Regions:
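Short, flexible loop segments at boundaries between secondary-structure elements
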Residues: 224-232
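Juxtamembrane proline-rich low-complexity "stalk" or linker regions positioned immediately after a signal peptide
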Residues: 1-2
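A cross-domain feature marking catalytic cores of carbohydrate-active enzymes
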Residues: 20-22, 44-46, 67-71, 114-116, ...
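Active-site mouth loops of central-metabolism enzymes
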Residues: 15-22, 83-93, 172-177
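Glycine-rich anion/phosphate-binding loops
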Residues: 47-51, 88-97
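Active-site beta->alpha N-cap acidic-glycine motif
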Residues: 7-80
Length: 232
């Protein structure tokens, strides 16, 4: 369409890092995304049927693998991961043990971001316990920013853990056209601010949307980068 031609002809500048959350449930979208050969960063939920397979596919494709660490949301009834979720009423030792176990289950990861976690990422004591493990293991932390008042990235910075914060979610809608519109919104954000971080999910519609626009995004002048290159 004419609209898309105009977008591609416009030269954007800046760096865009894209994190693919929820890897471990379904392998097909992960394979499809990895096959695009874009430097995406993949956040894997621990202990899922395909967590190890996803790690293998991601590392095999030369991409960045991360742990998608389940953390307590404001509404506990909405918690998707039950017993493996970091809770704010756990002791520091319990938090560290759960974090370490999840990290160890995915050898070769480079960093961590939070799954859910609006309550946990706004709790300083909980974040300090998680980040202590990450610091010991040389891992970075990306605050998924599921909650505007989360302080995960601030606490990480204060502890000397390399960190960054998500700026935009791309696939709150499962409609392909909506996802594509959000991808261009993220490109524009990266152009405006010099860089941006976007999160989407390992789902069929998301993989299909990226397949449609990846060439245009690459041609637009925006540079897709691993999230590790935008850490502060």
């Amino acid at each position: 369409t004419k609209k898309d031609d105009k977008k591609t002809a416009q030269k954007y500048h800046g760096k865009l890092a894209v994190i693919i959350d929820d890897c471990g449930y379904d392998l097909a979208p992960v394979r499809k995304l990895v096959n695009l050969n874009a430097p995406f960063s993949y956040a894997i939920l621990p202990y899922k049927d395909f967590s190890s397979d996803a790690l293998h596919v991601i590392k095999g494709g030369g991409q960045t693998a991360m742990l998608h660490l389940p953390m307590e949301p404001m509404d506990r009834t909405a918690m998707s991961e039950g017993k493996i979720t970091i809770l704010t009423d756990m002791t520091a030792e319990q938090v560290q043990q759960l974090t370490r176990k999840a990290v160890d289950s995915l050898p070769g990861i480079e960093g961590v971001n939070n799954h859910q976690g609006s309550k946990a990422t706004s709790n300083e004591a909980t974040m300090k316990a998680v980040l202590k493990v990450l610091k010991q293991q040389g891992l970075f932390f990306v605050d998924s920013s599921t909650y505007s008042k989360s302080i995960g990235d601030q606490v990480a910075r204060s502890m000397g853990v390399p960190t960054a914060r998500n700026n935009i979610f791309l696939d709150n809608s499962s409609d392909e056209d909506d996802i594509i519109a959000k991808i261009w919104q993220a490109v524009e954000m990266a152009d405006r601010n010099g860089s941006a971080i976007a999160i989407c999910h390992a789902r069929p519609h998301t993989a299909a949307a990226w397949s449609k626009v990846i060439d245009e995004v690459n041609a637009s002048g925006i540079q897709l980068v691993p999230v590790s290159s935008l850490l502060k």
